[in-house]
Swiss-Prot record:
RNA chaperone that binds small regulatory RNA (sRNAs) and mRNAs to facilitate mRNA translational regulation in response to envelope stress, environmental stress and changes in metabolite concentrations. Also binds with high specificity to tRNAs. HAMAP family: Hfq. One of its GO terms (molecular function) is RNA binding. The gene is hfq. Keywords: RNA-binding, Stress response. GO terms for cellular component: cytosol. InterPro entries: Hfq, LSM_dom_sf, Sm. This is RNA-binding protein Hfq. Signal peptide: none annotated. The keyword RNA-binding applies. Homohexamer. It comes from the Bacteria. Belongs to the Hfq family.
Length: 82
């Protein structure tokens, strides 16, 4: 994964995890999953609802937060809003 991808993905996912923001995750096959981000790494996201599911990032099309979340990209910019 490129550094630019990590500069955006990691702070965004970490803010969602840290603030317990409910999310909808749309997979490339059209399935919609809902829950909260429990954890993530380079390849997977753990999504918690009634159970915890491991979702591979390559299967994810879109992550939609249930509310606005502020996160910093770590580049000295103002916090980015999602």
């Amino acid at each position: 994964m490129s550094n630019k991808g990590q500069l955006l993905q990691d702070p965004f996912l970490n803010a969602l995890r840290r603030e317990h923001v409910p999310v909808s995750i749309y997979l490339v096959n059209g399935i919609k999953l809902q829950g909260q981000i429990e954890s993530f790494d380079q390849y997977v996201v753990l999504l918690r609802n009634t159970v915890t599911q491991m979702v591979y990032k390559h299967a994810i099309s879109t992550i939609v937060p249930g509310r606005a979340v502020n996160f910093s990209t770590g580049e000295g910019d103002e916090p980015a809003a999602a």
